[in-house]
Amino acid sequence: MRTTYMAKPGEIDRKWYVVDATDVPLGRLSTVVASILRGKNKPTFTPNVDTGDNVIVINASKVALTGKKAERKIYYHHTAYAGGLKERTAGDFLAKEPTKLIETSVKGMLPHNSLGHKMGLKLHVYAGAEHTQQAQKPEVLDITNLI
């Protein structure tokens, strides 16, 4: 009798990938990164287990915002005080905190529960070309053929 393989947390082999965000549209970058963080690129994908890999995104400040998203796309957050609704445009977000822009975009594509939080912790975003995870020997992932 054949049964469906269900991954167990101790059996997961995690890899490290480096993704260059230079001139890649934000949404397309985010979908590829979120898919890798979830583990959907592996044959051992199990929805209730974190089977994903670690992803390092470099050159976050050079990500592309297509169309007029830089002026028209607005990110909101609330300070929890009365009248504390704050808003920023995507262009302002990219200029001031490019790493947080990509983190927000990717984490919005992950499950909104404790498992999604664990997946989000495996995302490392850097504004420049240098990163601090050389010891993990990450593989360079060319996402132009994945988008």
Swiss-Prot record:
Keywords: Ribonucleoprotein, Ribosomal protein. CDD domains: Ribosomal_L13 (cd00392). GO terms for biological process: negative regulation of translation; translation. One of its GO terms (cellular component) is cytosolic large ribosomal subunit. InterPro entries: Ribosomal_uL13, Ribosomal_uL13_bac-type, Ribosomal_uL13_CS, Ribosomal_uL13_sf. Pfam families: Ribosomal_L13 (PF00572). Disulfide bonds: none annotated. Gene3D superfamilies: Ribosomal protein L13 (3.90.1180.10). One of its GO terms (molecular function) is mRNA binding. Part of the 50S ribosomal subunit. PANTHER family: LARGE RIBOSOMAL SUBUNIT PROTEIN UL13M, RIBOSOMAL PROTEIN L13. This protein is one of the early assembly proteins of the 50S ribosomal subunit, although it is not seen to bind rRNA by itself. It is important during the early stages of 50S assembly. Belongs to the universal ribosomal protein uL13 family. This is Large ribosomal subunit protein uL13. The lineage of its organism: Bacteria, Bacillati, Bacillota, Bacilli, Lactobacillales. The gene is rplM.
